[in-house]
């Protein structure tokens, strides 16, 4: 499978299973700690330094932008991605989620900071991601999950902990069907083309550096 040909590619063992497990356990602890602090008045829902339990794209999941461990993975994986795909990349941001039973990721495409997107499996129960390689526009209303009649069913991609799917996030629609497991940890690592129009203006998702919130 060639990224240049298909605009998506799977990299097996992009990180080791040991590193994936550390990140997954860290994500679980972060979710539990943030939930406890919110419920016990130690922080508030508007504090961007804690995770989000009410994120509109996937309600009832735990999500966090720019977590420093995940930003480390954002940088750490660039070399293997460039070697496997031939791409030249600059990092924009990371976004991690701990999914729970019944969660759904609706069909969508990404914003310009996600020219090259990845989903990296950290651990938990298997939950395939679907990607439409045709590049066609089928979403009428993402948040109401309304699509055009006859929208392609997409290709199912299954990832084990440490595996990564790379795809053209602004071009290829991607989604997940309702989650039937208990927990699944994923981190989305986003990049721009190093020689593209957003390389300088959008570096670090317009933040002064990695590891800070917007």
Tell me what each language-model feature is:
Residues 1-85:
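Non-heme Fe(II)/2-oxoglutarate
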Residues 10-12, 166, 190:
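Short, well-ordered beta-strand micro-motif
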Residues 76-80, 95, 117:
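Generic beta-strand or strand-like secondary-structure segments
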Residues 86-95:
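A short coil-to-beta-strand element that immediately follows conserved catalytic motifs
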Residues 98:
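Conserved active-site beta-strand element of glycosyltransferases/polysaccharide synthases
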Residues 101-171, 183-186, 194-206:
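Catalytic core of non-heme Fe(II) oxygenases with the double-stranded beta-helix
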Residues 176-181:
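Short proline/glycine-enriched turn/loop segments at secondary-structure junctions
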Residues 205-214:
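C-terminal helix/juxtamembrane-tail motif
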């Amino acid at each position: 499978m060639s990224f240049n040909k298909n605009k998506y590619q799977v990299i097996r063992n992009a990180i080791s299973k040991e590193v994936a497990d550390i990140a997954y356990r860290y994500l679980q602890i972060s979710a539990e700690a943030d939930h406890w602090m919110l419920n016990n008045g130690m922080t508030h829902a508007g504090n961007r330094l804690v995770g989000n339990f009410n994120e509109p794209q996937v309600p009832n999941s735990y999500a966090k932008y720019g977590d420093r461990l995940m930003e480390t993975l954002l940088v750490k994986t660039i070399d293997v991605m460039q070697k496997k795909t031939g791409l030249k990349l600059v990092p924009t941001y990371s976004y991690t989620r701990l999914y729970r039973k019944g969660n759904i990721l609706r069909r969508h495409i990404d914003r310009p900071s996600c020219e090259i997107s990845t989903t990296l499996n950290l651990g938990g129960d298997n939950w395939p991601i679907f990607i439409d390689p045709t590049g066609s526009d089928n979403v009428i209303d993402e948040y109401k999950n309304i699509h055009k009649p006859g929208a392609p069913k997409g290709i199912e991609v299954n990832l084990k902990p440490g595996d990564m799917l790379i795809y053209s996030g602004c071009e290829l629609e991607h989604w997940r069907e309702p989650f039937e497991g208990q927990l699944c940890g994923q981190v989305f690592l986003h990049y721009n083309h190093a020689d593209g129009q957003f390389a300088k203006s959008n570096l670090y998702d317009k933040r002064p550096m990695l590891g800070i919130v917007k």
